[in-house]
UniProtKB/Swiss-Prot annotation:
UniProt keyword list: Cytoplasm, Methyltransferase, RNA-binding, rRNA processing, S-adenosyl-L-methionine, Transferase
Function of the protein: Specifically methylates the guanine in position 2445 (m2G2445) and the guanine in position 2069 (m7G2069) of 23S rRNA.
The encoding gene: rlmL
Protein name stated in the entry: Ribosomal RNA large subunit methyltransferase K/L
Gene Ontology CC terms: cytoplasm
Organism of this sequence: Haemophilus influenzae (strain PittGG)
Catalyzed chemical reaction(s): guanosine(2445) in 23S rRNA + S-adenosyl-L-methionine = N(2)-methylguanosine(2445) in 23S rRNA + S-adenosyl-L-homocysteine + H(+); guanosine(2069) in 23S rRNA + S-adenosyl-L-methionine = N(2)-methylguanosine(2069) in 23S rRNA + S-adenosyl-L-homocysteine + H(+)
EC number: 2.1.1.173, 2.1.1.264
Assigned protein family: Belongs to the methyltransferase superfamily. RlmKL family.
Amino acid sequence: MKQLFATTSRGFEELLKVELTELGAQEAKVVQGGVHYQADDETLYRTLLWSRLASRILFPLIETKIYSDLDLYAAVSGFNWLAQFDERVTFFVDFNGTNQEIRHTQFGAMRVKDGIVDYFERQGKARPDVDKIQPDVRIHAYLNRENLVISLDLSGEALHLRGYREDAGQAPLRETLAAAIVMRSGWQAGSPLVDPMCGSGTLLIEAAQIEAKIAPQLYRLHWGFDFWKAHNQSAWEKVKNEAIELAEEKQREIQPHFYGFDLDHRVLKKAQKNAQNAGVSHLIKWQQADVAALKNPRLNEVGTVICNPPYGERLGTTPALIALYSVFGQRLKKEFCGWNVSVFSSESTLLDCLRMRASRQFKAKNGPLDCVQKNYQVSERKSDAITDEKELEFNRTSEVAPDFANRLQKNIKKISKWAKQQELDAYRLYDADLPEYNLAVDRYADYIVVQEYAAPKNIDENKARQRLLDAVTATLQVTGVETNKLILKVRQKQKGTNQYEKLANKGEYFYVNEYGTQLWVNLTDYLDTGLFLDHRLTRKMIGELAKGKDFLNLFAYTGSATVHAALGGAKSTTTVDMSNTYLNWAEQNLILNDIEGKQHKLIQADCLQWLEKCDRQFDLIFVDPPTFSNSKRMEESWDVQRDHVKLMSNLKRVLSNNGTIVFSNNKRGFKMNLVALEELGLSAVEISHKTLPLDFERNKQIHNCWMIQHI
């Protein structure tokens, strides 16, 4: 009996133990990352040929403790390698693990290689060559602290390489992982198996090979034991011939009941080719189909739906994935009553969009990703959520977040008509109208932006996440917007300058119309879009006041108020902001509206410092400072409640005799110090109610706005 070790992905050790035992392995013992077992020659070859879960099968040669690289070299060079293979073979060393002495795997591999070739030289033999591509022999070294195990890799190439996959989709599953998913899915051989997002077909191919009794390595041409001196050719031929006969016998019995669907016809062609290579093409039916129109191909039977849908690391944006999983769940409940469902994903929250309760779940790794496989039982009662294909889009909303969907629908009917009359492309459709759906929904031309407000600490995080997913799904259906045109953002309370920090680097800009102006927006790269929608009427008012006046825009952001002032006939405009990014944006807004000339100045500066040094006067000033800022680029912190009087003192100095300051901020509960302003010789009148547009009328505290003049 030989002592062997089968490696596998973490989480599959117990499953592998069961598989090896069924193949005849003795004394199987689970450890992290694999299973130790004993086998005679036939059982050894059977486990190599038939294991669907093992990554490699290793034959340990050296087990010792080492405390230096000299110990490593001595252990290797003192071993009788000629008993395993001769000098004419090529070899390669895989070295895993490090310790205080062997700090790099490449160094460890080099010392093992040196020990092997030096051993052959001492025996008067030629030095065997190293081949990194396709060696005759693979040596596997594993170091854990001072414990060293050096093994002969009898697999050769890793066992997940079945040989049937010539090409894969964008995010393929390893064959060993796919086999484990099938084994854990609850699918029973002989019953229908459907994969509605099959990609390159790995799940179905592995399942079909299981039912057809095709050994996963039946078509492998090269093995790690080909040049092993202990190789038992007769035992190997016996095991392989048994596998060939079993596959041929089983092929005649099986009827096709595997079904693969995918929206991408190109990846389906790859799946068909892979199935042909695997010897199961006659068992699987492939069809191009959208999951939103998924049909049950075996209505009178009960089977299993198995799926590895796209998730965060694979294809699509978050809103698209939310919609995909939601629609998938609805189709399952309509078409697959009484069926088993097994879904594998790295995003447990996306699985919540299925709106089904899992009966079992398993953790697994897909490369570096922590994933989960959840099994469900679809109710035998047909879901009435979708009764008519033609009304698919409308009726979906009645199942997912119906209260939110109804309110959004109502708001759209009211606000869209008003926006059209006002010639507006950008406006708010929903603003936390319902406490349980604490988010905002804005339309920017053909795009929808969903901004989630940070949930209060007393709200369960999972519940808040589920409500967000439901709201996104409902928004997609109610608005009819394409999934790639819905942008999802998480908005938190602003501190300092983090509202200006970059979130992405897509650089996708387009313009929207606002009262005859055109303004650039960017919906993805920053927390804000470049246009504060609640200040729309304020900007319009500035345009109406600006004719023939020298205009100053302080804390200008992207200069949208400057555009209104210039188009309103301002004699000159001065736009000041500390951010070069937003100042460039402001320049592009001016260019977009054909505003040019030396009279329109753009100045990058700390607004407060610039104001203290400014030596000219303005007839109309718009100042919209942040609530708070402690930017490193500012000499002192800024607090609008604390510092607004000092700001007004400096503004008074640059305000012409008949001039007007339009002052606004977003601090809730802001109190203007009217007494201090009067002492400065200024009067202030609050005009907040006049600057609040229809789409923000529910949120009367979103900003406060004041008209300030000399007494």
